[in-house]
UniProtKB/Swiss-Prot annotation:
PROSITE patterns: PUA. It is an enzyme of class 5 (isomerase). It comes from Emericella nidulans (strain FGSC A4 / ATCC 38163 / CBS 112.46 / NRRL 194 / M139). This is H/ACA ribonucleoprotein complex subunit CBF5. SMART domains: DKCLD, PUA. Catalytic subunit of H/ACA small nucleolar ribonucleoprotein (H/ACA snoRNP) complex, which catalyzes pseudouridylation of rRNA. This involves the isomerization of uridine such that the ribose is subsequently attached to C5, instead of the normal N1. Pseudouridine ('psi') residues may serve to stabilize the conformation of rRNAs and play a central role in ribosomal RNA processing. The H/ACA snoRNP complex also mediates pseudouridylation of other types of RNAs. Catalyzes pseudouridylation at position 93 in U2 snRNA. The keyword Manganese does not apply. GO terms for biological process: anisotropic cell growth; box H/ACA sno(s)RNA 3'-end processing; conidium formation; endocytosis; establishment of cell polarity; mRNA pseudouridine synthesis; rRNA pseudouridine synthesis; snRNA pseudouridine synthesis.
Length: 481
């Protein structure tokens, strides 16, 4: 029996000579990443995505489903939820009922990636029916197809679930597979931006050829990082896999049908995080330079990256705050901000607040030399004020500002309110009391029915006033038009 490989990165003083070409998912070609440091303290928490226990594996899994023709995408996803007894399911972008092909179904934790998958590029194979023969034949059709690439204006079809507004969508590439002028049929492949209507593209092709056309059949062959050649499964596969586990406790089929969510993130550039910084990132902290282990070449400022652990788990999708050049030269600063956290909180233990500065701050707070929020007060040592930099303060050092405000308040003597001001305030209060007494006297002794009637009339009067006001505003706007 072949020995099972442990796909985990260990601390090392020098650059690794392990060949990671065959390692799975985010750890593939790990040895080619640029090294910031090889030293870190491994924490025995979390596990490799392929070795998670079955419950965690399903809860952070995705299925590359071959959607059948006729049911809608939402129906299919609802069936999957019922079959797998999951809490939440989501999909990578709606397919029309008659359209078949690649529908990525995300389960529980993986639903956090739905938004990014819906915006990913798509590829389709389409059968188009022309309404008549074209004189130029295949060459003319190919030319028309090439013309309709790049940014195109599109309006959603008549029967669509969205508002029919004119929008711009990009067609990256298209290829003609087959064309039959006698039968007025053509088959072509197209790679496009998310939200492109192939039905509208077919109508535009017909207009360009001068004969009219419509879409006969459509299949999605790729959605984001997953294509129909990469472990696509049917609804029957999912049903059988769940049955096999329920009745024979065999989880191998389920593990084959469901893929870890990391398989959707293989196209992102990677940043490897130390185990001690993982939980802080899960709580939304920015990743700083001390928490960085390795990073990919070619990262640009503002680019979306995936933050991962040494075991190959995805922690979050982040926005890079430094380019690759800065990451290799800087000794402090923010590496990335969290855009969407994927990992569960407290899967790794908390390791923040254990540094020398944090411990010193705790000591000063407990001895009363800092206030309960960690800000400086009059008892704060001068050394702390000059050396400590509060990064959470918006403008400059907030602790110093707080001290200045306190000192200012103590320095300026409190002004006593003048006699005239007191008298005028008393007069206003007396007038208010008289008004309240009059109101109470007017409604004294009324029955509950009378009170209800009075309230109803008051409400009607208010509504009438509102209607009159809105009508007046409408008339004014019409006049201005």
């Amino acid at each position: 029996m072949a020995k099972e490989v442990d796909y985990t990165i260990k601390p090392e003083a020098t650059a690794s000579n392990i060949n990671t070409e065959d390692w799975p998912l985010l750890l593939k070609n790990y040895d080619k990443l640029m090294v910031r440091t090889g030293h870190f303290t491994p924490i025995p928490a979390g596990s490799s995505p392929l070795k998670r226990d079955l419950k965690s594996y399903i809860n952070s899994g995705v299925i590359n489903l071959d959607k059948p023709s006729n049911p809608s995408s939402h129906e299919v996803v609802a069936w999957m939820k019922r079959i797998l007894r999951a809490e939440k399911t989501g999909h990578s972008g709606t397919l029309d009922p008659k359209v078949t092909g690649c529908l990525i179904v995300c389960i529980d934790r993986a639903t956090r990636l739905v938004k990014s998958q819906q915006g990913a590029g798509k590829e389709y194979v389409c059968v188009i029916r022309l309404h008549d023969k074209i004189p130029g034949g295949e060459a003319q059709f190919k030319r028309a197809l090439e013309t309709l690439t790049g940014a195109l204006f599109q309006r959603p079809p008549l029967i669509s679930a969205v508002k029919r507004q004119l929008r711009i969508r990009t067609i990256h590439e298209s290829k003609l597979y087959e064309f039959d002028n006698e039968r007025h049929l053509g088959v072509f492949w197209v790679s496009c931006e998310a939200g492109t209507y192939i039905r509208t593209l077919c109508v535009h092709l017909g207009l360009l050829l001068g004969v009219g056309a419509h879409m006969q059949e459509l299949r999605r062959v790729r959605s984001g990082a997953m294509s129909e050649n990469e472990g696509m499964v049917t609804l029957h596969d999912v049903l059988d896999a769940q049955w096999l586990y329920d009745n024979q406790r065999d989880e191998s089929y389920l593990r084959k049908v469901i893929k870890p969510l990391e398989s959707l993130l293989t196209t992102y550039k990677r940043i490897v995080v130390k185990d001690s910084a993982v939980n802080a990132v899960c709580y939304g902290a920015k990743l700083m330079i001390p928490g960085l282990l390795r990073f990919e070449a070619g990262i640009e400022l503002g680019e979306e990256v995936v933050l991962m652990t040494t075991k190959g788990e995805a922690i979050a999708i982040g926005i890079a705050q430094m380019s690759t050049v800065e990451l290799s030269t800087c000794d402090h600063g923010v590496v990335a901000k969290v855009k969407r956290c994927i990992m569960e909180r407290d899967l790794y233990p908390r390791r923040w607040g254990l540094g020398p500065v944090a411990l010193e701050k705790k000591k000063l707070k407990s001895s009363g030399k800092l206030d309960k929020y960690g800000r400086a007060n009059e008892a704060t040592p001068a050394k702390w004020k000059s050396e400590y930099k509060d990064y959470s303060a918006p403008d400059g050092d907030s602790s110093q500002q707080a001290v200045d405000v306190v000192a200012k308040e103590e320095a300026s003597p409190k002004e006593e309110p003048s006699l005239e001001a007191n008298e005028s305030k008393m007069d206003i209060d007396d007038a208010q009391d008289d008004e309240d007494k009059k109101k109470r006297k007017r409604h004294e002794g009324e029955t509950p029915e009378e009170r209800a009637e009075r309230k109803r009339k008051k409400k009607e009067k208010k509504e009438k006033k509102e209607r009159r006001k809105s009508k007046q505003e409408k008339d004014d706007s019409d006049d201005s038009d």
